[in-house]
Structure formats: structure tokens, C-alpha cells
Design a protein with these regions (language model features):
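Short, hydrophobic/aromatic beta-strand segments
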Residues: 50-57, 68-69, 102-103
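Intrinsic-disorder/low-complexity, polar/charged segments enriched in Ser/Thr/Lys/Arg/Asp/Glu/Gln
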Residues: 36-38, 86-90, 126-128
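Secreted, periplasmic, or luminal enzymes acting at the cell surface/secretory milieu
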Residues: 1-52, 58-60, 83, 111, ...
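Intrinsically disordered, low-complexity Pro/Gly/Ser/Thr-rich segments with frequent PxxP/GP/PP motifs
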Residues: 65-101
Length: 171
């Protein structure tokens, strides 16, 4: 029987040099569906020879109304760096690219948390940050979903809700 894990992850490859992902700057932590998130990553060639690195931006939808992939590649760049050189790599993510088809088959960008992952391969994530798409982030005193918040139930106690859960293995 074979394992569901791939032999080589997406983005896996060989290099004669090494790279360090030092930090990332995000244009915003709260974005709207019409926005474009800009992520700037500081990349340094820490090896002794020049080389190229594929900097990849993945997105993970933390909570979704429908089943979504564990992570999706949304942007990448392949800079060339000399030994010891540091470069800022800019990746752009139009938030509309997070759209999915909901249960009523409408294409929507759901409000909620999305984890932005920066790495060299799908299984080699170096930097992570959570952003929030929508009007306001989830707070500790309200349990929110795209169409309903718990504080709405307190205002309208006769309202009925249906709760659905999707559990994922892995990340």
C-alpha cells in the first residue's frame, strides 16, 4: 500500500547554495475583498556560490464554510543572488484570489482568518502570519463565522443556527 504523502513536495529542488528568510513585512493585517496584500520578504544568500531561490507564498483558510485545500500556492518569485547578497522579494496577493464557491454555489471571498505562509517548498515553510479578511477581526469575547456572530444570538435569542465543522489532518 502506498502512502498519501508525496515523495517530493511541490517546490522541492536542489541548490548549490543556501538561503535564509530573515523577515517579512505585510501591507496590512486586516484586508477587504477588493484589496491586494503585498508581502515583502528579506532573502539572503548564505552560501558560497551564486544561486536562484523560488520564494513561494501559500495561503491556508483557517475556517471555511466548505472544504478547501490545506494550503494553496498563490504567488512566487525566483530571484538570483550572489553569495552574501540580501534582496527584498515582493509578492502580491489580490484578495479576490481567495474566492471560493459557497454552499449556494456563489463565488465569494469569505470573511475570516487566513494564514499566509512563505517558504521554499510546500513542506518547507519559513515564515507565517495570520491576516483577517473582512470588516473586523475575531475577538476573544465573540465567536464569529462569515454569516453569523455569537453576539447576534444574544440580541436575538430565538434565532436558530446550524453548526457545521470540518476537521483537517496536518497543518
Amino acid at each position: 500500500m502506498s502512502s498519501p504523502a508525496p515523495l517530493w513536495s511541490f517546490g522541492d529542488g536542489l541548490s548549490y547554495t543556501t538561503f535564509e528568510y530573515l523577515n517579512a513585512h505585510y501591507s496590512a493585517e486586516l484586508v477587504h475583498p477588493s484589496d491586494t496584500l503585498i508581502v515583502s520578504v528579506s532573502l539572503k544568500n548564505t552560501g558560497s556560490v551564486a544561486g536562484k531561490e523560488v520564494v513561494q507564498l501559500y495561503v491556508r483558510d483557517v475556517v471555511s464554510s466548505v472544504v478547501t485545500p490545506v494550503k494553496q500556492l498563490k504567488a512566487f518569485s525566483k530571484p538570483f543572488l550572489q553569495p552574501g547578497e540580501m534582496q527584498t522579494v515582493v509578492l502580491k496577493l489580490p484578495i479576490q484570489e481567495l474566492a471560493l464557491y459557497d454552499l449556494s454555489m456563489k463565488k465569494v471571498v469569505e470573511e475570516g482568518e487566513y494564514e499566509i505562509q512563505i517558504g521554499t517548498a510546500s513542506d518547507d515553510i519559513r515564515l507565517r502570519r495570520t491576516i483577517f479578511v473582512g470588516r473586523q477581526p475575531v475577538t476573544s469575547n465573540s465567536i464569529c463565522h462569515t454569516a453569523f456572530c455569537m453576539h447576534d444570538l444574544v440580541k436575538n435569542p430565538v434565532r436558530k443556527i446550524q453548526v457545521a465543522v470540518c476537521v483537517r489532518d496536518g497543518e
